Amino acid sequence: MSTWLLPENIADVLPSEARKIEELRRRLLDRFRAYGYEMVMPPLLEYLESLLTGGGRDLNLRTFKLVDQLSGRTLGLRADITPQVARIDAHLLNRQGVTRLCYAGNVLHTRPRGLHATREQIQIGAEIYGHAGLEADLEIQQLMLDALHLAGLGRVRLDLCHAAVLGALVDSEPAAAELGESLYETLAGKDVPLLTELTANLPPVTRDALRALPTLYGDATVLEEARARLPNAPEISRALDDLAFLAQQVGGAEVMIDLADLRGYAYHSGVMFSAYVDGVPNAVARGGRYDKVGQAYGRARAATGFSLDLREVARISPIEARSSAILAPWQAGEALRTSVAALRDAGEVVIQALPGHDHALDEFACDRVLVERDGQWVVELKS
């Protein structure tokens, strides 16, 4: 086997792509900071039980596992940073009020999510802890939309769902609860024939409500249809009220309701949301409320957040990240060194062409040159 080959669905990030990813990372983290979010950096490696808290079977299957040579315990390479940030909030920071945290880091998956998807994503996201009201959900959704607009993704559609709708249906009928993750996955995939088969032996009220979920998709008016077709349970009514409020308040995106968009249902406890853009079949960002995740770390806290894959967003972003630069000669001399240093201190990219390599600068747009005029080094437009 050639030594330069990489595993399937693993790839190097080359200069042009890396520059674009880094540009977006800085933009987004700066915007998170402008909203008051503090940066945290969880480790890539943790004990497996910490990484899998509340994540369900899907997260377990996506997590690489290995044995710690020091303790003999099973370790995992993180497949999602969200549980790690919940651990930091619950166990390390231990604050009583509202905490806003953000992060950016690599995650590894045992299996790709799609045919051409990478197994090494660069996950970036933000989380709010300590406020159970819809104000936190609204803020995190607006921050996500702001981040996508900063990335140059113009027309964004926001799909809203609520975990309490399915939760109320399942909790009211033990036979439905026994279907477990197969039910969630079938609804998320909108596999109507399989859903019909799975629910065949359920009581009519629960059966009809579950079969209605994939069809309850559309603008905010579909909520009235949902009220008519779903049981009049308090939990369902509150969930639909929450969605109606958010659909009215969110700005900067087309808002749709999708009561079967249940990806990540395993650890969500309230409003769930996904962002879509034209020409991309899968969501470019996802988020939602997960108030119970902190329980495993000894302290349950109201929590909501979102995340996205920077590599995927960079791939579809129209932002041009090619850097303009100043081309300087390679010469000895204090005056030239001083001029180059001053330009770099001012934030300019200055490339000194090594002898014999004046034209090997394809990755940079050298639109200016540093030339000597009357004993002074000055910047001029490149002819």
Curated annotation (Swiss-Prot):
<dbReference type="GO" id="GO:0000105">
    <property type="term" value="P:L-histidine biosynthetic process"/>
</dbReference>
<dbReference type="InterPro" id="IPR004517">
    <property type="entry name" value="HisZ"/>
</dbReference>
<comment type="pathway">
    <text>Amino-acid biosynthesis; L-histidine biosynthesis; L-histidine from 5-phospho-alpha-D-ribose 1-diphosphate: step 1/9.</text>
</comment>
<comment type="function">
    <text>Required for the first step of histidine biosynthesis. May allow the feedback regulation of ATP phosphoribosyltransferase activity by histidine.</text>
</comment>
<keyword id="KW-0963">Cytoplasm</keyword>
<protein>
    <recommendedName>
        <fullName>ATP phosphoribosyltransferase regulatory subunit</fullName>
    </recommendedName>
</protein>
<keyword id="KW-0368">Histidine biosynthesis</keyword>
<comment type="subunit">
    <text>Heteromultimer composed of HisG and HisZ subunits.</text>
</comment>
<dbReference type="GO" id="GO:0004821">
    <property type="term" value="F:histidine-tRNA ligase activity"/>
</dbReference>
<comment type="similarity">
    <text>Belongs to the class-II aminoacyl-tRNA synthetase family. HisZ subfamily.</text>
</comment>
<dbReference type="GO" id="GO:0006427">
    <property type="term" value="P:histidyl-tRNA aminoacylation"/>
</dbReference>
<dbReference type="InterPro" id="IPR041715">
    <property type="entry name" value="HisRS-like_core"/>
</dbReference>
<dbReference type="InterPro" id="IPR004516">
    <property type="entry name" value="HisRS/HisZ"/>
</dbReference>
<dbReference type="InterPro" id="IPR045864">
    <property type="entry name" value="aa-tRNA-synth_II/BPL/LPL"/>
</dbReference>
<keyword id="KW-0028">Amino-acid biosynthesis</keyword>
<dbReference type="GO" id="GO:0005737">
    <property type="term" value="C:cytoplasm"/>
</dbReference>
<dbReference type="Pfam" id="PF13393">
    <property type="entry name" value="tRNA-synt_His"/>
</dbReference>
